[in-house]
């Protein structure tokens, strides 16, 4: 019997697919829809300490091979998501969910994480070090010195399972440098990758989104080769106890298969979920299982990380 079960940080999930933070996760109603779908779990919208309106609209546009967005971290604030998760873990104690977080400053990041640390939350926390769409706020994970300092400060008090969402890296030296930092800390996972920052999409003679004069994060099929490269580069470099969530360009079961082949333990769906709705989880899962049957694989462990090279 073919199984797409997986585990992260010792938590088991019935399916390796889930939503990506930012899609179908703003409201409790959306999270419930993902929870009740074929997805193995969900991650919340990336929460700041307080409610954020985000950037002015239009700020998201589906385009032929993906999407462009400059959402600006709209969310309902930490308490909205944390309270929901605390309630949910009592009702569905057999399941584990992800809480995505970011501070608008290092101080706010620590305030948020300390609140989670002091709460009864028993799930997985994802710290977003890679949002490209907040004007005036750089992507932290491109600054290795700052990343190292923040992680050192966080792990001085945070003892719950924690992972980080990363921007795409493009240089082999940067993979080496980033992995050397991450390997110093008890991270449970890294999520590769957030959207490729500051792309530009034009229709006729105009940009298609309002913020930043049309510059926005690129997602979807455009970014799959970059996402796969990041997944595999970190799979090769990170300590085995730091698992990888693959995100970027997952339209089909084949795309999910490739993420796992590159080393991903879980696969997130973003642009496709926005375009297709939660039925995408059923379709992609069935396509992935069909590939596994064809190849004689019974579990993800049979092929995870076993990408072949040409001699």
Swiss-Prot record:
Keywords: Cytoplasm, Flavoprotein, FMN, Oxidoreductase, Pyrimidine biosynthesis. The active site is at 131 (nucleophile). Its cofactor is FMN. It catalyses: (S)-dihydroorotate + fumarate = orotate + succinate. Substrate binds at residues 45, 69-73, 128, 194-195. GO terms for biological process: 'de novo' pyrimidine nucleobase biosynthetic process; 'de novo' UMP biosynthetic process. It comes from Streptococcus pneumoniae serotype 4 (strain ATCC BAA-334 / TIGR4). Its EC number is 1.3.98.1. GO terms for cellular component: cytoplasm. It is an enzyme of class 1 (oxidoreductase). This is Probable dihydroorotate dehydrogenase A (fumarate). Catalyzes the conversion of dihydroorotate to orotate with fumarate as the electron acceptor.
